[in-house]
Amino acid sequence: MAKIIGIDLGTTNSCVSVMEGGEPVVIPNAEGSRTTPSVVSFQANGERLIGQVAKRQAITNPEKTIISIKRYMGTDHKVNIDSTEYTPQQISAMVLQKLKADAEAYLGEKVTQAVITVPAYFNDSQRQATKDAGKIAGLEVLRIINEPTAASLAYGLDKMDTNEKILVYDLGGGTFDVSILELGDGVFEVKATNGDTKLGGDDFDQKLIDYIAETFKAENGIDLRNDKMAIQRLKEAAEKAKIELSSATQTNINLPFITADATGPKHIDMNLTRAKFNELTHDLVQRTLEPIKKSLEGSGYAMSDIDKIIMVGGSTRIPAVQDAVKDFTGKELSKGVNPDEVVAMGAAIQAGVLTGEVKDVLLLDVTPLTLGIETFGGVSTTLIEKNTTIPTRKSQVFSTAADGQTSVEIHVVQGERSMAADNKTLGRFTLSGIAPAPRGIPQIEVTFDIDANGIVNVSAKDKGTGKEANITITASTNLTDDEIEKAVNEAKKFEAEDKKRKESIEVKNNADQIVYQTEKTLTDLGDKVSAEDKATIEEKVKAVKDVKEGEDLEAIKKATEDLTQTFYGISSKIYQQANPEGAQGAGFDPNNMGGANADNASAGNDKKDDNVVDADFKVEDDK
């Protein structure tokens, strides 16, 4: 059976995992890291960079580098690059394509299906947008799963025989969630969830950026926030300082030549203490405490009922965050999970549940926000309360507001406010063909159906005439089927172009390497090579150099192969002449270009360096 991957599509970093031998395993990316920056960059030559390589060049290419696109999922936000507009779904799809490609390279097989995580407090539009991104990337998204729920799966997989109530505190790069779950006998039941989709590590970085910029402005009269390249350097420095202050009490921010004026270049060289960082970000930390309180209220539990607190997301490494949660809850924090990887691992476990690889696990999640329709007077009438276990279905009968009314518009909203206008509009549809009657007489049954992904379907039926209308909620910010199809084709085109560009680089690098090795070996052999053979080789070298600057890859491959075979034949002849009784000898091997010299090229490749030790990440396990 084909593997289903689990993906944590994060605001700042993403991670991919898969089940192997009944356990979730994090898949390293092509660069060797276990997480991939959710960064996309477009180059002047049309090349597209994704992940760490895109993040590295953000300073020199700030206008065409896209970060934290997840914050715009489910909105009508567009990114304009070279007069081409990209939706958040398309940019996210590019990150997903990178994760998909890394998974395929690791597994050695095609990957077409995935479970993708979203913040628990994502609304319907944001969930739909995430599914669309997966489709554009060439993935069938079998399930959308909430991030805190995924984390609880990874935490509780080896604790199936225990009964625990856990609180998952998930502070990522751009979003924040709190979920209360009950674990017991393989059942993972979410009792309540709350959060803020506009709060995360990016906001902590921004506090530092503003502080550094304001300090610099006070000293030099220049606002660095008006300079895109300078602001990108500030972002990088702020993130680095934040990370360093998690383990040190002071850090130095040194940015030479940050800008210049008539008096010359300007530099930043300042020390930042953890105490100052805590002061700057105190309000952000405090904002995370109210959702804890609301989640407890929604679950019906007291803090004393909670057995474990699981900290998820890179931003939970901030000491002030840990201290605030400990002080607020009065409990020690669990150290049994890796906050950067646990969500992806949970997604892989859910994938294992879907394939049957993981047995005796039942996941019961909830809808994070109240769902209802607008009724007379603009009131929001609730059909499904927040924290209702999904999947679920709920019906309610309504009537007309005017005499002789033959159609009604169903306005579907999501949110906690009493007036429909103050809530998030999920969609509108019309039920027509109602038999004319005095107001209040027709009976119109409205049914809400939420699937396991948290995605909403709404139907309305006139019980008198049997007329029916329904809608799968797709807000105006979501893509139509045609738009998705177009985006899929564009993604395939990008993928093909990237593949061709990569092949071109590899072919040209190989040609360069063989030319270098040939010329070096030719020099080393000296007068052992006849003038005639030397002329033949030099002619073949010139042929490679002539074609390798072009784009005809087949011509480069042919010229390289000709050079390889010609030199191999000549070098073999030389070694045979030097050792007529011996075998072929360790001549120039065109298939082994890794050695620094000919003597080492064909030997010792399998020998392990005794000075190299394998490193592994170890987390403390809670028993």
From Swiss-Prot:
NCBIfam families in alphabetical order: PRK00290.1, prok_dnaK
Which segments show compositional bias classed as Low complexity? 591-604
Span list, region Disordered: 580-623
Q: What's this protein's name?
A: Chaperone protein DnaK
| Residues with Phosphothreonine modification | T175
Q: Which organism is it from?
A: Clostridium botulinum (strain Loch Maree / Type A3)
The role this protein plays is: Acts as a chaperone.
Bias (Basic and acidic residues) occurs at 605-623
Provide this UniProt record's keywords sorted from A to Z. ATP-binding, Chaperone, Nucleotide-binding, Phosphoprotein, Stress response
Reported induction? By stress conditions e.g. heat shock.
